[in-house]
Structures are given as C-alpha cells and as structure tokens.
Amino acid sequence: MIQEFQIRVLPEQAANEQSLKQFIGHDKGLDIRTIHALRILKRSIDARQRTIYVNLKVRLYINEMPQDEEFTRTIYNKVDGKPQVIVVGAGPGGLFAALRLIELGLRPVVVERGKNVRDRKIDIARISREHKVAPESNYSFGEGGAGAYSDGKLYTRSKKRGNVNKILNVFCQHGASTSILADAHPHIGTDKLPRVIENMRNTIIECGGEVYFETRMDSLIIEKNKITGIETNTGKTFKGPVILATGHSARDVYRWLYDNGIEMETKGIAVGVRLEHPSMLIDQIQYHNKNGRGKYLPAAEYSFVTQVEGRGVYSFCMCPGGFVVPAASGPHQIVVNGMSPSNRGSKSVSYTHLRAHETPEHL
C-alpha cells in the first residue's frame, strides 16, 4: 500500500530517515516496522518564526518496496537516417531542443562555437588566473552554455513555464541528484553539471545525432526566402531546418539577423550590480540564530522586490554559499556572475540587485 502525507518537522528530523519514520508513525498511528520505504516528494523550509520547520510531502510504501525509479525516464529511440534539424548552440536551450527532436523522431545536428564542457574549463580557469578571455571559450560560449560554470540553478520567472517537471526528470536521467525533484529551489551545482551535460551529449550521439564543437555559425543559408541551413567558420555547411539556441552573448548572430532583415523582438532589460554578503550574516538573519544555520539547515537565501520611482527593483540569481566570478565573453569587457557548488559551502552569499528598464527602441 502507498500513502502520501504532508508533514512539518524539525530540521534534524528531516535529515534522518529513521527519525522521519518515527515521527510519521507516531503522528499517523502507523507501525514503523510496516514502512518499508519512504520518498520525499516536496521539501521547503519555513523560517518565518523563531523555530525553523521543514515542510515535507512524503510517500510511504507500507509492506512493499518501490517498483519504480525516483524519476520518470524519457525514451530516446534511434534516429539514424531520419530528417535532420540543425541546432545552433549547445547551451541548455540547444541540448534540450536536441533531446526533444529525438523524441519526435528527428535527427539533431548540434553546432557549438565553443569547446566541449571539459576542455572549456581550462579556458575559464585562465580568466581568473591570467586575466585572459578566449573569445569562443569562456563563461558564455561552450558546451553547457552560460549556466554550466555559473551555478546550475533551476529556476524561472517566466509565466510560460512549460513542463518543468519533465525538465527536472531529464536532468535526473542524465545524472543529477533526485533531490531537485523535491526541493522548492532546485540546484545542481557548478561542480556537478559538467557530468550531466556530457551525459546529455552522449544520449544525442548514441541515438544517431551529431555534435560539432569549435564550429561557429557565420550565416544562415536562405533560398527562395526560406532558411535551408547554415554556413560555418570551418567551411562546412549543414542543410536542414534551423533552431537558433545561441544565448544572449552571441551578438554577431543578432547583427547578422538584423542586417539580413529577419524580424526580431526586443526584451526588457534590467541593470544593476552583483554583491556578496558573509554567509554567516544571512544565516543569522534568516534563521534567527546568532550561531547561524547549524548542522541540518542549508545556506540561507532571501529575495526581495519593491517599486522605486515606478520601476521594479528586485534581487535575482541568489547564490547561497556562493561567490562572484568573472564572466566576460570577450576582450574589453568587465562582466561578473555568481555561482555556487552543489554543497553551497562557501563563506559568502552572492546575488544580483537589479532595476528594470525599458529597452530603447533604437536597440
């Protein structure tokens, strides 16, 4: 028999499965010897009062063991010989587009201007160590996109959210911790993401797709007012329908689109600064404890939003247990970002303080 309950427990109880079973057994009148397995479906922290609680949705397996995995697998069949679609960019948009194409029985050909996620790490290290930015291999360009080496937070403010649960399950299928399925603010971590990204690439290739690195799209091929492929800096052309998943830093792509009369639409922008606080300070404030978060609570985070002179001012990309990193994608730039490793163990907290601005029409 399977039963699900909503419970509210102390952090030390939430951290120990046996303690959870004992609490549930006492609270729900169950013999804990009959609870053969327990899964946490949802997890969030309630820090509004002095006593901190963890809200959980749990699934109990009474006198039986789970017969399924903790996540739902997507079936990816072979697409050798199927019609091909060109995906420009191997960031999250490009990788998930390629996986979706395989689901639909189409063969993705992914073209990425940067390096694979492992080789890219060497160039990123040089930014901090030598203050040198490789224009095609940096925090923005390369396999995994801007998020691969800047946090791995899984969050969206968009109202067009799509099937978020499926996205999380695809991450788990490729090696991410199943904790992201339960956490209110799921986070993979910069140190864990490269392996997940490699596994996604391997799925694409094993199914019959192709992935090309250090191959930059220089122009679209347009025949009879129809996009039929791309030309690249290597001299190689790729034919087929095109998905542009080029991210916000590929300015050359957007200049080419503009110069060739392809319709584009501006987005609003936000301008601000990235800050760091001592992690202990935020833990003390959020958890109402001069000793910080203690053994059983994660690094604390916060968010705020207000109006100043009729414009929104808000926090963004909170990185608890994280820090500021240089993130320029070309020479003569000063750009920073924030990131956290999976354990969020840094002694600092990083976040961005932004003010919304309308995009000028001439841009």
What are these regions (language model features)?
Residues 2-83:
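Extreme N-terminal leader/targeting segments of oxidoreductases
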Residues 6, 119, 125-210, 215-216, ...:
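Conserved N-terminal/central alpha/beta ligand/cofactor-binding core
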Residues 233-241:
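Core beta-strand elements of the Rossmann-like FAD/NAD(P) dinucleotide-binding domain
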Residues 213-226:
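A conserved short coil-to-beta-strand element within the FAD-binding core of flavoproteins
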Residues 106-124:
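Glycine-rich FAD pyrophosphate-binding loop
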Residues 352-361:
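Conserved small/polar residues in nucleotide/adenosyl-binding loops
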Residues 85-110:
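N-terminal Rossmann-like FAD-binding beta1-loop-alpha1 element of flavoenzymes
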Residues 244-291:
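Glycine-rich loop(s) and the adjacent beta-strand/alpha-helix scaffold that form part
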